[in-house]
Structure formats: C-alpha cells, structure tokens
Amino acid sequence: MRSSLLWIWFTVFLILQGCVNATVQPNKISKAHTTELKQRYYQVKIKASDGTLIAFTVYQPKLSTNQTAPLILHTHGFGLSRMKRPELSLYGFLLPTGQVAKSAWKKGYWVISFDQRGHGGSQGKIRLTDPEKEAQDVITILNWAEQNLPQLAKNQNGVRVGMIGESYAGGVQYIASALDKRLQAIVPITTWYDIVESLAPNGVPKSNWIDFLNLIGDWWNWNKFDPELKQAYRDTQQQQLNPYIYDFLKTHQASWFCQREQPPQADALIIQGFRDVLFPFNEGVKATKCLQEANRQVHLIGVEGGHLQPFAQHSPLGSTPFWYIGKSIRCGNQKSYDLQKTIIGWFDLKLKDQNSSSELPEVCIDQSPVIQINDLKPITSYDLNKTWIAPNTTQDVFIPIHTANQKSFITGSSLLSLAVETENDDATFFISMAVKSAQTGKYKTLNEQTTPFNPKRKQLYDQIISRLNLKTQNYQDVELPSINTHLQQGDTIGLLVHSQSKYYKRVKQNKVEAWISGQIKLPKLWSEKEVTQQ
C-alpha cells in the first residue's frame, strides 16, 4: 500500500513539473567579460548534431567579479525528466542526485540538469545510451556551456566538468567520458557496466524488469522508443537473447569501451547496491577495475539498496518504492559517511582542488570489513559433489557449502563451475546464495538476489558474445550476484535452487530435475577478530 501511494505522489509531481514551461534564454556574454553574477536558473533548448532539440535547465551560481566555477551536469533516471526547478520537481525535492546538484549550485557550481532525448522536454527517440545519440548529446551540451556560460573554471582539458546521475543517467556518464576528456569527475550511481549481461544474465531476459522499463519508457513517455529498441524489446518476449539484441546494445555499455582500450577518462566515485536486482553490485566492481587499469582514481561505495523489483521487493520506510540508496554508510575503516556530503566533497576535491575533510577508502561497503577491490575476489574453492535436485513450486533445494565455526563476514561475488545432467534441455534453474540459520533452521536468500541458469541458453549466450561456435562444455561458468552479510557461529552458507523466481515471471515450469556437480569459489570469510583489528 505504501509503495502504491508513493507511486501516485510521483505521478502527481511529474505532472506538475511538466505544467511549468517558461523558457528564459541566457544573456550572451563575451569570453573576456567578467562581472558579479546573481544566483538564478533558466530554461534552454538547443539542437543536437542530428537536429534533435535537447532541453535543459541552467543553474547559475552567485559569483563575484573574476571568480570562476566548475560545471556539474545532472541528468535523470529512465522514464523521468530533469530538475526543471529547484523545488517543484521530483529531483528538486526528493531524489538524492537532484539534492546533490542543488547543493552544488548553492555552493558555487554551475549546474546543468538536462532531459535525455525522448524524455521530458527533449525531442527524439530513446536509444538506450547510444554513443552516437545520447552520449553525443552530453558533448553538445558541453560545447554550448563553453560558448555561453561566463566565468567557467578551466584547466588543460577545457572546462572543469563533473557529472552525476543514477541508473540510466549513470550509463551515459561512462560512455560520454570515454568520448570526451572534458568530463573529469563522474558519479555513476546504481548503473550498468554491461547492459546485455544485466538485462539477460546467462542469456535469460529479466522479463519483469524489462516489461516495467517498456511501460515507463514507451508508454509513460508515449511512443518514445526507437524502432530498433522496440524490436529488441519484442525479441525478449521469446525469453532468450538473440544476436539482434546484442548487436543493437553492445556499444551502449562501458564494457565495450573498456575491452577496446578506450575506457572512461574521468576519475569516478561509483555507488552500487547489493539488493539491486537490475544492476547488481558486480557491475560497479567491473567498472572500478576498468578505471583502475586505465590509471584513473576511483572509489567504489556499496550501499544496501538500488533498483527494487516493483511490488516484489520493498524499500525501508521513508524511502522511494522502487529505488533507494540510503543517506549514510559505515565503512570497513569504522568511519561513517554522509553520502550527499561525501559526493560534494569529492567534487570539491576533483574540480576545485580542495582537500577532503575525510579520507574515503578505495572501497567503502556499508557494514563490511572490505576496503580494497582485491578483497572482493572469490578465493576459496569448494567442491560440489554430484547431487540429485528436484526443486518445485513449493520446495526449494539447499546445497550446503560451508559452516561457520565463529562469527564471520563475507562480501563479494561467487563463481560457479557447474555441470548439469537433465532430460529437459530447456530447464532453467534459479540459483541464490543463502544462509541456513543454526538457531532456527530456516533459509535466508542473501540480499534477495538470484541468478537464472539454463545450460542451453547459456551456451547460446556465450556464442553470441564471443562470436564463436563453441562446443558443448561439461562445465559452464556462472558468476553469482555479490552478497554482503555476516554468519553467526554454526550458520551454513550454501546454494538455494528454485524452479521459479518472482523476478522472471515469464519462465513457467512447475518442477525441474537434474544431477548437478562442479565447484564454487567464495570470497574471503572474515573473522570478527580480523574486522576489529582493521
């Protein structure tokens, strides 16, 4: 009920936001002229390189004569629209990236909040962060800012620019940064590194989320999907990934650029969530590694939330219903950080050369001892002896892996190497990391995550990605979503196998039967003593 009421409020505010349409054009100021600037905001529309009108709001800071200020670009999540006003807008009064952008403006930053094509006041069709469309729009806005905004701070790369946004607004940051070095500091929040793997893990489409994205992308924003995106959506209804979908989306992700030695050129503060069933924490880990290999300065923050499956997961009281990140975190260095203040402080460091008041570790995960990216690696192998499983709609199967002999902490993703023998060559297994409580004997799925594994579709998926006609393998590798939890003495961590999933409603099967065997690698198990000694 609470989620429904919040959704209604979202709708009301989005309608109100769209009802105010006054547009104020900036005063043309020569590059040599400096003056005292008053704090204000105004609306602008410009043409992209292909003639598409792009709408944005310029937030002008209060600046004294000869004072300069960096620029922060802000944009919105999928199906939403920009911070058109500092109060009467969804981002202006509620969503955290808007709050950060508004705080930056009041602290003396130029801020541009823009509608991505196919959203809000911008024209065009949605192509899901196409490097030649959505990412080029970012570059077009940067060009406009350099030519029209007075007293912009600059360095050897041009205007000193940062960018922030969540989800859909995060994916475009990686790509735009790979294309334009003027973006010097990015804050991608709960977004993808590999959109193909995120939307169709192991070749099985996330039908519930994909249907929801179609609803808000092509129905809420009426008929705004590009024809190619419409076709890709229709193809997912067949419950498998085909070459057409991959060919359309392959360049719309950071992984494409990283694998071709054209990584993002900005330093990054990446925020990713463990309950996020659309873009799991793994996506942030992979992006962090890419940027580190490119010698960029990067911090990874792990929060509890992220994207929640509508009506299947629930956010904490007071949070938005389908997405949240929380307000503060406590890292492995035993320090607490306010998220919004941390982001502003990081922008101050990168764009204003101001020293940060608090040292953020390389990796900061809420309630976890991990402080370095290498701490997340799977390192300990366990054999999975050949076992007969037959999960059905009323009974899941638990496969024990390790029983804790003391209180322990575990954070990171696990790697499965799995062999499956089954008569049904199209059976899908839903695999979760889970803990069996020593006290109650009950199972708990960790971070509400699950991974689909269909041996036949997994092989097709690997062939599409690699462009090779791969031979059938006895063992197939499966990366499980990252977990962040602790075990009490006597608790057992293991795999929980289901025949159905609330995240994949289009997969209909009452029962699956198979012999399974293989190996699993778990991340480090931290003892309580190791944690207290950090």
Predicted segment positions?
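Short alpha-helix in the alpha/beta-hydrolase fold that links the catalytic acid
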Residues: 280-290
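Short substrate-entry loop that stabilizes the transition state in hydrolases
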Residues: 65-69, 77-107, 112, 117-121, ...
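Alpha/beta-hydrolase active-site loop
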Residues: 129-150
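Glycine/threonine-rich phosphate-binding loop and adjacent beta-strand/alpha-helix elements that clamp
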Residues: 20, 24-30, 40-45, 352-534
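Accessory cap/linker subdomain of secreted extracellular hydrolases
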Residues: 94-100, 106, 135, 147, ...
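Catalytic histidine neighborhood in serine/cysteine hydrolases
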Residues: 291-316
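N-terminal cap/lid segment of alpha/beta-hydrolase-fold proteins
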Residues: 29-67
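Short beta-strand/loop motif that positions the catalytic acidic residue
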Residues: 264, 270-272, 276
